[in-house]
Amino acid sequence: QIFIGQRFDKDKSAWQMPQGGIDKGESPAKAVIREMKEETGIKKNYKIIYECKTWYFYKLPSYLRKKLWKGRFIGQKQKWFIISFTGKDEDINIKTKKPEFKKWEWSTQDNILKKIVPFKRRLYTSIFKEINNIDG
């Protein structure tokens, strides 16, 4: 099962896996833990078990480019990780200082591909392809 959250966007179908930026001087592994804590409230019972080998990129549709990120970017380059969470659902708290999600759920890859915004489908398909082919 994979954690996904429904964003506080006008588009009620805006579900996604947690993600975020890498601060200056921060490693991707440190950034993923910081973002996970900020977006899910998870503080313990987790472990990074895989770092994707590829940096993934997606482009925003042209109608969103001016609305998001003040028009400064056309998309995002991302590094993805698999994190094992062995805690309880009660350890998850999306009502953080700056909440990004209004709802969350555990989901399957197929269901996630149905729920996310269409412009991220190719990205998520590529990520799932890589993690489904991990040896061991």
Regions flagged by a language model, labelled:
Residues 10, 37, 123-124:
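Sequence-pattern detector for short linear motifs
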Residues 13, 25, 126-127:
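A periodicity- and composition-biased signal for non-globular, repetitive helical segments
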